[in-house]
Amino acid sequence: MNMTQIAPRYLGLLLALPLAAGTVRIIQTNSAGDNVSIIDPVTNKVVGEIRGIEVNHGAAAAPDGSRYYVSNEGNSTLDIADVKTLKVTKSIPLTGHPNNIAISKDGRRVYVSIAVAPGAVDVIDTTSQERVKTIPVKGAVHNTYVTPDGKFVVSGSIASKTITVIDQKTEEPVWSLTMDLGIRPLAFAANPDGSTKWIFVQLSALNGFAVVDFATHMEIQRIKLPELPAGKAKFLVGGNESHGMAVTADGKTLVVNSRLNSSIYFYSIPDLKLMGGTEVGKSPDWVTLTPDGKTAYVACAASNFVSVVDIKSMKEVTRIPVGEVPKRNITAVLP
């Protein structure tokens, strides 16, 4: 039985149990419902829910383990939930309809993609729990990220086909790149010193990804994902063919979703050679990895489950039923 079907009193008993230091949780938003699923990657079971967030989209976790942040598309707010009780404690009004979100390394700022023209990233101070700034960018923003070194905020726009890079300290744009197709999810490769080397870019109508050199601000490579074997039917996705990427913590593997193929693929870094892939559920929309880099959790939007994939064997090991139309997910480490 799915955890979401268990009587609330039993969920309450589970939530009352203290979390061990270093507990990992997969936070899975369900965009067609009002619930966010909390997954334990040890048991691969749903162990709790955040309820009452209309059309929940992006998620982030406070580094101190106290709060979850979820963008609420229905009400155009950033909702804050207590990690222990999973209750929403505050809703912060935004300047427009939000999409994905990101949190600064110190947890003091949440950056919210505003997915309406002319385009902006809202800045939320997590101490005052208020919007303190809006950063104008070119085009409605689909996704926003903080680079692994914490120095930059990077947004991408489908409409304007533009990546905007923002200095995290000044919260001002420092460079941008307009490409030939709409900007979908991003991921990052690092230099040996931890600084950002490349941006991996998924693009509208491309079953693959581009590589942008962070230093030169130029596209240097474009890679197409494998074609399906003969007899396998493509999944019709309306031009959004590849959506969701992640890089393992050791920086050696790029995991790439293909909505068109209902599969995920694994590429070595830095040579970007295909190592393998596996079929998952329909319309894999996002992917997050465990901190040890051993397991991928793939949100399958058209199947209403999360595919769990062992990265070493590149095989799906189980499926976790969640809510309706699961999309964005993150990995939270609760100290």
Give the positions of each predicted feature.
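Bacterial N-terminal signal peptides that target proteins for export
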Residues: 1-12
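Predominantly soluble domains enriched in secretory-pathway, periplasmic, or organellar proteins
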Residues: 18-335
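Leucine-biased recognition of intrinsically disordered, low-complexity hydrophobic segments
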Residues: 11-19
